[in-house]
Amino acid sequence: MKVRNLFFTVAALSAICTQAVTFECGGLYYTTTGANTVAVARVPAEKATNNPYKGVYIIPEQVYYDGANYQVTAIADSAFFQSKATEVQVPNTATTIGECAFAYATDLANITLPLHLKDVSKMLLAGTNVVNVAVPEGVKTIGWGAFQSCPMLHTMLLPSTTKRIDAYGYNNCHNLFEIYCAAPTAPEASGWAIFIGLSGIDVIVPDDDAVAKYAANAVWGDESTFTLYPSEEVSISMTGEVEKYNEHYMRFALGNNLAYKIYKGDELIALTAADFYYVPITAEGAEYYIVPTNMMNDAEATKVVIAPSAVKNVTDDRDLPTVYGRDGSIYIHGNTYGEMVTVFDMYGRLCFRRATNGDEVITLDRGIYVVLVGNHPTKVRL
């Protein structure tokens, strides 16, 4: 009996230790979903009245809390429901976005979905004011009511992996003008009221063979709703305009009712149909390529270079940060807002990394660390 009671005690303690924790970081709330993972969460009810989500959100890939780094792998159900967010850029570390995550956020006009998103969930962007939306490759299903009642929705860009659009998918989207669908065969769209009452929608598909397949489909072949066209070459010239958004980010001006593939060097980092895409300001600078696309054909790339000079330089010893260790924590003071803070242990392992919002307190285990604030290194012993 004592052994059995001990078992239940250990199990109960284990459950307590693994209980999800919600915390705030950089203006967003997160809930732990695993030992090193979090989901963006809705503003807690007791704080929602005075501190709702509003404005632009560039969600980071990683956040730091209570001595540990957490990877952002999801957006929770209803996280931005009825919020005042205007633009949201979701990081590629997120693979799932919950039901109603952005539903009825009526100020939301721009969204960048992550490259590794599994599916477009139920009511994902219902009731928002998004104008153009690109869905990344790999997504198979557009969920129930995902874009229902989006009055400003003009252009949808769907990947070659699209297999199904569920009921009410585009119900009441009366300004939907064009759908670019890279799927070679018509996605199943047999649910109720997916396109009911809509008309004058141009559907652009990969080629003439795909046009024939879509035309033979009971839904996509409805000439009172759709006109089918094969994809053509994309020809658009871009200025490569880039502007400083704030101390942390530069942004590319996009638009034109198309999608854009964004490369950092040779690495694809985004597919978006938003008006803007945000990239971090770093001391090293970076080279980007912007490629307009309709999901089937790409235009020529435009090269954009973010020079290291975009980063504030230290010009006076008084601008150098103060970094020291005390009572198990690293303290950083000074003119550091927007600087990238990186901490390595004595073996070169990364322990902490994020752009600072000002003074920083980092709690770590006992040991020797190298703290890099921008380009300024300091050795600290805890």
Question: What function would you assign to each model-found segment?
Answer:
Residues 259-273, 281-296, 303-382:
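C-terminal outer-membrane/trafficking sorting elements
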